[in-house]
Amino acid sequence: MYLTIWLVPLLAVGTWGQKFNRFCHYNSWALSRNPQHGLVPEDIDPFLCTHMILGFAEIDESGLRLKDPNHYQQQYLYQRIVRLRRINPRLNMILSVGGWDKSQEGYSKLVSSRENIIFFTKWIITYLRRHDFDGLDLDWEYPTFKGSPMVDKKKFVDLVENLAYEFDIEEIPDIKWKLTLTWTADPLESVRTSAYDIKGIASKVHYVNLKMYDFHGHWDDPLRVNHHSPLTSSNSPRNVNELAKTWVKAGVRIEKLILGIPFFGRSFTLKTANMSAPGSPAVGPGSDFGDGIPIHNLCHIIRGGTKELYLPEKKVPYIVSGSEWIGYDNPRSVMEKAQLVFNNALAGVMIYSLDMDDHHGTCGKKWPMMMAVIHGLNAYMEYIDSKHKSLELTYNKKILRARVSLRNYRRRNQQGKVAEMEQRIRNLEQELQQSMGNMAYERQQAQAMLNRGVSLPPIEQQSWSW
């Protein structure tokens, strides 16, 4: 089942030759979750995403530099996340600056003068290269809000223009590529019209990441239960489909547009427990106290017997447990959102955030949400092939190094070492041959599955019930 394409005049249905970007947020606090749900960089499958966004760095009080990570664990995190490229050399590493609670004072100070912008731009390029990042994400929440003066709307464009120019003219170091510049934006009209010069910014960045979530929450007034990330809706423009159209009409080219997909739910406490239909009055946040409930927690609630309900008009699920109402996404709904990207040849998706998926597989298979996104983008064979190419390359590098060592041992007439290295080479070649056989079988199985078609789960099927 495919969504109605909203860009019919521009595009044909289906873009099978296109590769879609998968930007995946990984936040530093993922390390501090309890052991059952914490996600360390070493446990990330580096082929799930095309870009990793590490959040969030903070601009210091001077507006000229980023603050140093405040403890050893965070300092070491840069190195650990970048090491994923040893397994997948094509994985791009993006550093995100800002976020909800780390934006306002630093950004306003940064753009307060032309001199600050020029200094910061030169400094950040050196910083990104030193820490082996491939790009920068600007997540200012938001110009002209929370004490930011109205002039910051224009000055943010000045910052973006300067960064884009310096990124473009940078003399690229050996084995490096040009730095990527992305902008993460709130798509809602209440922010969009006041905070952003959309054309001015979008024309200079490589990608525009739209946060297609948190459309509703405990901050609403009047407070009523509503899903925070509906795909469609007939009675409100606050839905992914309509907001994407709005931003395209505002001047964002579709090949730059990245749609955000949440891996968390938003909860409410119902005013009256037996009045739980969408739009019912609420008195505050639910058990998450406004922080959001990760999928790796929600899946246990559903597996425990709480009935999953579905909003067909909005194409998203919700649950009611006592007086708590939770709107969230499941594998079906994120697959439909990814299909919207595929069907309209948008640039890709932004996952917020990777550590909120069921990455340990405690409710079933590992990475259920991320795999649903990959299938929705018709990128599963790309995912499989990337893993296989990397494994083959790794073995060939090991064999090459072993052969170099073997030549050295022979030159030194170290017969014991020669015999040992010859055996190692035979073992590696045998392992490679076995791995190639396994990979061929895995690819065959994957292709057979795709030939049968990967359809959306039935609406009545409860997620994580298998």
Curated annotation (Swiss-Prot):
Keywords associated with the record: Coiled coil, Disulfide bond, Glycosidase, Hydrolase, Secreted, Signal
Signal peptide: 1-17
Pfam families: Glyco_hydro_18 (PF00704)
Domain GH18: 20-380
Expression tissues: Prismatic layer of shell (at protein level). Expressed primarily in the mantle with highest level in the mantle edge and lower level in the mantle pallium.
Reaction(s) catalysed (UniProt annotation): Random endo-hydrolysis of N-acetyl-beta-D-glucosaminide (1->4)-beta-linkages in chitin and chitodextrins
Chief localization: secreted
Localization annotation: Secreted
Gene Ontology terms: biological process: carbohydrate metabolic process; chitin catabolic process
Intrachain S-S bonds: C24-C49
Active-site residues, Swiss-Prot/TrEMBL: E141
A GO term for molecular function: chitin binding
EC code: 3.2.1.14
Name used for this protein in its record: Putative chitinase 2
Organism, scientific name: Margaritifera margaritifera (Freshwater pearl mussel)
